[in-house]
Amino acid sequence: MSLESSYTLLAPMYDFVIERPFRKIRADSLSRLPAEPSTVLVNGIGTGLDLPHLPTRHRYIGLDLTAAMLKRARPRTRGIAMNLVQGTSLALPFADDAFDHAVLHLILAIVPDPAGCLREAARVVKPKGSVLIVDKFLRKGQWAPLRRALNPLVSRLVTRVDVVFEQVLAKQPNLRLVDDRPVLFNGWIRSIRLIKNA
């Protein structure tokens, strides 16, 4: 089953499963957006669960792979300068350095090529811009035999559970890590802030 098909089927129940455990985590991550008005890419906007936590001083583009997710996000855009775009995170339909910042909440461990997704985010963010990430990651060298064993099945349906963030970041020399916090499930879910080199 393709990623687009999986998330089209999941759209009606996505909020029920994901909203509550990630509410404060999303808000805390988005509070790290700067005070000055900026242009921000919300990559993998899904049903729009980030929208209630977005500071209204910025202008946003929300991108998602599926029309079903964007349809659910649209009503949440009221009161926010937000345009919704259907597209893939692996080939963003935006020019280089188009955004001041990017938000990647629960997207890097979903796409089939996490390094490609982060590379695209780095491409469209201006130098000195930030990339805010919340997702499930293994730590480098972490054994996690059950997660690794389940990954072939789970990744075909909804998400990868074997992504090692340090390996993904190592492929992006133009991004530097400035903050990495364990936020849920004994550190499996992490909140990360990167800055693009000048």
Give each language-model segment a name.
Residues 1-37, 49-50, 72, 76, ...:
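Conserved class I S-adenosyl-L-methionine
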Residues 19, 132-190:
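C-terminal alpha-helical "lid/dimerization" subdomain adjacent to the S-adenosyl-L-methionine
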Residues 39, 128-130:
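Short glycine-centered segments of the SAM/dcSAM-binding site in methyltransferase folds
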Residues 39-91:
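Class I SAM-dependent methyltransferase SAM/SAH-binding core
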Residues 90-102:
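A short acidic, Gly/Pro-enriched loop at the edge of an enzyme's catalytic core
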Residues 101-113:
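A short SAM/SAH-binding and catalytic strip from SAM-dependent methyltransferases
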Residues 115-127:
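A short glycine-rich, Lys/Arg-flanked "PGG" loop and its adjoining helix->strand segment in the class I
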Residues 191-198:
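C-terminal lobe and adjacent flexible extensions of AdoMet/dcAdoMet transferase-like proteins
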